[in-house]
Amino acid sequence: MTDADMSVLNEVFDVIMDRKNNPVEGSYVCSLLDHRKGINKILEKVGEETAETILAVKDNDRAEIIYETSDLLFHLLVMLAATDITLDDIAEEMKKRRH
């Protein structure tokens, strides 16, 4: 995987942060961030997507694993944005763990 391939995560996170700071009516991200259940709605989605990813792995369905992992990563990015944690914060923690 190249840095350019990973840049899509930064791009998606930037869009999520923009939606957080500049809400757009009808935006799915805004509907999660502004849901009446608050962070619990986002966590429900993270849990749902985690379960779907696990089932895809169990079924050894490569296409479904990729699809569900993408959904999971997206909802994890929304969760991070909601809790004011950046991808840089995560990258720094990962760097600490690689040695």
UniProtKB/Swiss-Prot annotation:
Keywords of this entry: Amino-acid biosynthesis, ATP-binding, Cytoplasm, Histidine biosynthesis, Hydrolase, Nucleotide-binding
Enzyme Commission number, as recorded: 3.6.1.31
Cellular component GO terms, alphabetical: cytoplasm
Family: Belongs to the PRA-PH family.
GO MF: ATP binding; phosphoribosyl-ATP diphosphatase activity
Enzyme class: hydrolase
HAMAP family: HisE
Keyword Cell membrane: no
Subcellular localization(s) per the UniProt record: Cytoplasm
Pathway(s) it belongs to: Amino-acid biosynthesis; L-histidine biosynthesis; L-histidine from 5-phospho-alpha-D-ribose 1-diphosphate: step 2/9
Reactions accelerated catalytically: 1-(5-phospho-beta-D-ribosyl)-ATP + H2O = 1-(5-phospho-beta-D-ribosyl)-5'-AMP + diphosphate + H(+)
Coiled coil: none
Entry-linked PANTHER family: HISTIDINE BIOSYNTHESIS BIFUNCTIONAL PROTEIN (PTHR42945), HISTIDINE BIOSYNTHESIS BIFUNCTIONAL PROTEIN HISIE (PTHR42945:SF9)
GO BP term, pick one: L-histidine biosynthetic process
The protein's name: Phosphoribosyl-ATP pyrophosphatase
Domain of life, source organism: Archaea
